[in-house]
């Protein structure tokens, strides 16, 4: 989530639910107040910070995931420090492997990543998790997000995949 939707009361309630070590919400926050909205268009910094604080203060485990571009690469250390100060349990800065977006430049000294030819480790099986998209739809994993043909309506259907070697036929 970019953390920009809902109220602090809502995030506080979610924080009470996501309070186990294996439960967490990833907040995609790409820089600091002056740069986050360059990629996260129309996202209000103060709302994101208030929502994240409400979630964390209610006991929720929050992860900060930062996409690094040329315009925000100088803020990685400051963002990581802010994440610690706020009580985030984890911070990751990463360069997007997606096709470049108009107006956004890769950071300096960036090189195309080498293709990974090793085995794929399924996060759903390892973490016993699911993915909820920006519209609140439930999917078996983040790799299948926005694929309406694999939309799940019941969390028990996702839980069944946690005890198998193949979480979803689409993953074959």
Regions found by a protein language model. Name each.
Residues 88-92, 96-172:
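Accessory C-terminal segments flanking Radical SAM cores
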Residues 1-94:
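Radical SAM/AdoMet-radical enzyme domain recognition
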């Amino acid at each position: 989530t970019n953390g920009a939707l809902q109220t602090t009361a809502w995030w506080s309630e979610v924080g009470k639910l996501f309070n186990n070590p294996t439960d967490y919400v990833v907040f995609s926050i790409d820089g600091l107040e002056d740069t986050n909205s360059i990629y996260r268009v129309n996202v209000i910094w103060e709302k994101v910070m208030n929502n994240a604080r409400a979630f964390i203060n209610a006991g929720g485990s929050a992860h900060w995931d930062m996409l690094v571009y040329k315009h925000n690469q100088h803020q990685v250390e400051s963002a990581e420090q802010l994440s610690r100060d706020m009580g985030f349990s984890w911070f990751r800065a990463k360069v997007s492997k997606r096709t470049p977006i108009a107006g956004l430049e890769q950071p300096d000294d960036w090189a195309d990543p080498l293709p990974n030819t090793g085995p794929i480790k399924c996060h759903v099986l390892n973490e016993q998790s699911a993915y909820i998209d920006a519209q609140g739809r439930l999917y078996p994993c983040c790799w299948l997000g926005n694929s309406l043909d694999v939309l799940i309506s019941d969390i028990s259907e996702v839980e069944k995949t946690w005890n198998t070697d193949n979480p979803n036929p689409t993953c074959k």
